[in-house]
Regions:
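Mature-chain termini and adjacent capping regions
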Residues: 1-182
């Protein structure tokens, strides 16, 4: 009788660190202030990511106030800023980035404004699923489901609304990276 009572009374009443329905991925394993990383392919710099803080979750890293620089041929082709960012570390999205909250991109050929933006590293293109605005000089182009190369030389969108001025647009622009879906 005493043994049964001891087993019953000695049960732990501590709450586990993560709730049973919470995935292991959601529980951060490391948090850093002033985070910085870069991605290279065959020794060639492709992008850099700098943020105020980062939280490592196993297959991805959350970043607060990220700044991303995307490089082509060793030169910055676009600089992106947002409120939140995510770097994917494995799987089909490996080395890709997801930015949310007041995303602003600046390239030599214009500016980009949206709420959600994906840098699809393998394809070498930007994708904004929701409304995006591209500004070149006085020209403004608004649409959804934007696909673009990082210099904004080539942009494709649906549900277009625009005010375009010839002085801001170059005829027959073509970029070496296709923007069509894979």
């Amino acid at each position: 009788m005493f043994f049964l009572l001891c087993v019953t009374c000695c049960r732990s009443t501590e709450t586990p660190v993560s709730a049973p329905d919470e995935s292991v991925e959601a529980v951060p394993t490391q948090k850093l202030d002033r985070f910085s990383t870069q991605h290279t392919e065959a020794g060639v710099l492709k992008w850099t990511l700098v943020g105020d803080t980062s939280t490592f979750h196993g297959s991805y890293i959350d970043v607060e106030n990220p700044t991303v620089q995307i490089f082509e041929d060793g030169v910055v082709s676009m600089t992106l800023n947002s409120q939140k960012g995510k770097q994917f570390l494995n799987g089909t999205k490996k080395d890709s980035l997801h930015l949310t909250g007041n995303v602003v991109g600046v390239s030599k050929d214009g500016k980009l404004f949206t709420e959600t933006l994906h840098w699809q590293n393998l394809a070498g293109r930007l994708y904004a699923p929701d409304e995006a605005t591209v500004v070149r000089g006085d020209s403004t182009w608004i649409g959804t489901e934007m696909l673009a190369n990082p210099t904004l030389e080539t942009v494709k969108m649906k549900n277009n609304r625009f005010n375009l001025y010839p002085k801001d647009e170059k005829a027959h622009e073509h970029h070496k990276t296709p923007i069509e879906p894979e």
